[in-house]
Amino acid sequence: MEGQRWLPLEANPEVTNQFLKQLGLHPNWQFVDVYGMEPELLSMVPRPVCAVLLLFPITEKYEVFRTEEEEKIKSQGQDVTSSVYFMKQTISNACGTIGLIHAIANNKDKMHFESGSALKKFLEESVAMSPEERARHLENYDAIRVTHETSAHEGQTEAPSIDEKVDLHFIALVHVDGHLYELDGRKPFPINHGKTSDETLLEDAIEVCKKFMERDPDELRFNAIALSAA
C-alpha cells in the first residue's frame, strides 16, 4: 500500500515563514533568500544564520552519488553527535516540512515558541524517538499536515496535482556541536560535512550546496534559503 503523499512546498521565504508562524514559532528568526553563492551576495544575508535549506533536483547523477556516499560511510564510519535531531521521510513530498523541522529542532534553544505551539509540542513529544519513530509521528500529526497543505497552496506558482511526481527535494544544513550536518530524510543517517561554527555556518553550508551544483552542471533548479536572526 502506498504511503501518504503531500503537496510540495516552495523554497520561498514568505511561504516558509508563514508556515512556521502558523505552527507557533515566534518570528525572531526568519527565512531569507540566498541570491547567489558568491561572497558579495552572501554578504547580503542577515547574520547570524542558524540553518540553510537547499532545494535541488534528484537526477540520475545524484542518485548514483547518494548510493556511493552511503556505502562509503557505512564502510568507513563517521562521527555524528547524539545531539543531532534527525528524522526519516516516509511521506511523499514532505521534504520541505521535514527540512523546516530539522532546521528548527537543531536550533531549538535559539527559538521562541508561542504558547500552545504545535511545532514545539511535536518536538517535545519526539525528542526521545528514533528517526523512524519521528517519521511515523509526523504521519499522524494533523496540525502539521494541515498547515503544510495550506502553505503548499500559498506559493507563487500553482501547486501541482497531489499525484504528480516531483523530482525536487529539500535538505537542511545545520551546525550542531561544532560540526556541519546535512539532514535528508531520504538518507539513512545525517552526513557530517566537517567543522563549522555559528559565525561560518552560511559560508560552510554554501560550500556543500556548490558541490550539489557541480555534480549536475546542466541543472539550473537549485535554490537556497537561510534561517537568519530577524
UniProtKB/Swiss-Prot annotation:
Q: Could you tell me what this protein is called? A: Ubiquitin carboxyl-terminal hydrolase isozyme L3
> Mind telling me which residues the site (Important for enzyme activity) is annotated on?
D184
Q: Active-site positions, per UniProt?
A: C95, H169
Alphabetically, the GO molecular function entries are:
cysteine-type deubiquitinase activity; deubiquitinase activity; peptidase activity; ubiquitin binding
Q: Known Gene3D superfamilies for this protein?
A: Peptidase C12, ubiquitin carboxyl-terminal hydrolase
Could you tell me which residues belong to the region Interaction with ubiquitin. Crossover loop which restricts access of large ubiquitin adducts to the active site? 152-159
Q: Which gene encodes it?
A: Uchl3
A GO cellular component annotated for this chain's UniProt record is: cytoplasm
Where mainly located?
A: cytoplasm
Q: Which GO terms describe its biological process?
A: adult walking behavior; cellular response to insulin stimulus; eating behavior; positive regulation of fat cell differentiation; protein catabolic process; protein deubiquitination; retina development in camera-type eye; ubiquitin-dependent protein catabolic process
| Catalysis: reaction(s) | Thiol-dependent hydrolysis of ester, thioester, amide, peptide and isopeptide bonds formed by the C-terminal Gly of ubiquitin (a 76-residue protein attached to proteins as an intracellular targeting signal)
